[in-house]
Amino acid sequence: MSLIEKLFGKRQKTASIARERLQIILAHERNGRAEPDYLPQLQQELIAVISKYVKIAPEDIKVQLERQDDLEVLEVNIVLPEPQQRTVA
């Protein structure tokens, strides 16, 4: 073992360094993702189910996911029409 290797240690291969960095970036992005993949589909399914009973427009439903420390809160806001317009034909 040469003196340089003793002082600085063995160098990692570029591919393994790149892989480690990519894993860190992916883990960070997964944790920082504001909206899970299923929210748009959940919103569409809610629209379909609620439309069976009440006449609503797609923009009348808002689905949000909020994170607070270790807690996740799914918030669903639905704007309902006036009572005389609620029935579905």
Swiss-Prot record:
Pfam name, any one: MinE
Domain of life: Bacteria
GO terms for biological process, alphabetical: cell division; regulation of division septum assembly
Cell division as UniProt keyword: yes
Annotated InterPro entries: MinE, MinE_sf
Cell division as UniProt keyword: yes
Annotated keywords: Cell cycle, Cell division
HAMAP family: MinE
Function: Prevents the cell division inhibition by proteins MinC and MinD at internal division sites while permitting inhibition at polar sites. This ensures cell division at the proper site by restricting the formation of a division septum at the midpoint of the long axis of the cell.
Family statement drawn from the similarity comment of this UniProt entry: Belongs to the MinE family.
NCBIfam families on file: minE (TIGR01215), PRK00296.1 (NF001422), PRK13989.1 (NF010595)
The protein, known as: Cell division topological specificity factor
Origin species: Laribacter hongkongensis (strain HLHK9)
Name of the coding gene: minE
